[in-house]
Amino acid sequence: KYLPIKYEHVVFCHLSPFQLALYNLFLRSPAIARLLRGNGSQPLKAIGILKKLCNHPDLLSLPDDLEGSEELFPEGYKPGDRRHVAVELSGKLSVLTRFLASIRSNTDDKIVLISNYTQTLDLFERLCRLRRWGFFRLDGTMNINKRQKLVDRFNDPTAPEFIFLLSSKAGGCGLNLIGANRLVLFDPDWNPASDQQALARVWRDGQK
């Protein structure tokens, strides 16, 4: 009863034209046809491809993951290019980027960005570096001692870093990110309990 009111919003984002073209290509592929006939043996792999595609096409190994996808590439598109982030190729990332820019320009808020995929966190990290947005990152590769130091720095209200990148697997019990008053769950986990654990990192005792 001592916590502020929590507002949850589900934001629906349109696929970019490139995402939509790749999505339809995959649905028409022989692999999906086999799955629909009950002959396919890798339904989880297919779902994983669609989940990554909905985050950003750069998370896929193109054209290997989607045969024939090279015919759909926008002019100048280079799969695997790690020097920049093509924000416009992802509906979700386009919305998120505008949201982060608004927070940076108009508020003193801090935000936690959560994803199941370290590849997506890599994408966020490149975006932050290119936009010169201060951030911290915590994933499963970081040891316990460094984690707490990172959390303490982020929770310091005078710290200039306003973004905290967090893998959902690392966002379990005991992690207290009350320095943030906003959180974006970029993609859901298979287990809803994992999502709830991650969401609880912000809305907890000490939150203003």
Give the location of each predicted region.
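Conserved Helicase C-terminal RecA-like lobe
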Residues: 2-19, 27, 37-163, 167-171
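Short, conserved loop/helix-junction motifs that constitute active-site signature segments
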Residues: 3, 177-178, 207
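Flexible, active-site-proximal loop/turn residues at the rims of small-molecule/cofactor binding pockets
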Residues: 170, 189-190
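A short beta-strand element within the Helicase C-terminal
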Residues: 175-188
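Conserved SF2 helicase motif VI
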Residues: 191-208
